[in-house]
């Protein structure tokens, strides 16, 4: 009879001991763990794994390997709800961690708190597996070793048995805070030992201005988030404009505006994008106008917005539209640029004023603007060339035109490179107009050197004309033969 009583009593204490080992926080914490399914470019299942929320608005962590090659991903919560992964926010392929955002379908989701300090060697640890059941069996163990990663972060060796299906499950401390992301064991010690990358290290992963070139991120087809700071995000936008598809770039602009709603640059960039699609329908121009108006509302430097509006309208008119959209004329462009100048007469605004006046064939007004620019800190070969061509169109003294071209070429890199060589051709023709044939011939020679002899028959004809007028008859004969 005593033996019969002892057995149930022993079982009772074993059960009680097992329950005591399961911390109270497990029931709530397990709801933050989810399953992930990733899909390739053909929308076929690529990988399955685990992850967990670290913020109630959908920020989550998992392993990078799970996402490599994925075009989309879906998380499945412990309650069976499916939610898409919307943004990749950072990754490290060496330590196999990734940070991402889930487009949650609820106001908030259960989330774990990331531990601020690393547990000590010998501390208790719990691994929370993904489960759709009410009860959950935690894997318990100890922290065997703590090593440094990237200076202030940590990587853990755990005395704990882990199954393959537990990769990327959270590893918790006694307070119910997550300190690690479980990683696959390897080698001969897989029965008693596993590893965990620091959750704080995974949280530190970010998108930077240079992330567009990161091979680890490029191997994931899911959309990337923006850098957290405005300056970095603006650089990222600039780089993305030439590397992303139009649709992806538009989504990135939308993200920027949501993230930095008080930054006028986002509205200006999106307005320019909308205007570039204007040929597909007037509604795109309507959207551009709405963004320009919003930019004016939020901008601290309204002159910059007026300048960009004028610049866009100027470019629009240069494209020679079949039918002008509303008031997008040179006159309206000029009005906006002059509003910018009234606020702050920056040389770049005055240069745009000159360009618009030149397009309107108001050459006197354009020359006056270019002359102001040429006394400023942005004077360049291009600004002096603009002044020279404008003066030429005004039938100005040919020698004064040449003098402006001299200033243009003086500001070019010396010796003249192929990029600046066309200015030599322009000055050669202006020298001919000023009856300075020998100087024209020398300009043609300099051009020939700058382009390393890559010229055509027309070049030899013009140089022959200069040589003939300069009474260099043998040279003229040689060039006409080449022509």
PLM features: residue spans?
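A conserved glycine-rich beta-strand in the N-terminal activation segment of trypsin-fold
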Residues: 21-22, 39-57, 63, 82-84, ...
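Flexible, gly/ser-rich surface segments that form the specificity/activation loops bordering the active-site cleft
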Residues: 21-25, 108-155, 162-166, 182-193
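C-terminal cap/linker of serine protease catalytic domains
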Residues: 22-26, 109, 181-252
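Conserved active-site neighborhood of the chymotrypsin/trypsin-like protease fold
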Residues: 55-126, 133-137, 152-155
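Structural motif corresponding to the intra-repeat A-B loop/turn of tetratricopeptide repeats
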Residues: 243, 277-278, 282, 316, ...
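Alpha-solenoid helical repeat scaffolds
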Residues: 268-269, 304-308, 348-353, 382-387, ...
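Residue-level recognition of tetratricopeptide repeat
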Residues: 272, 276-279, 311, 318, ...
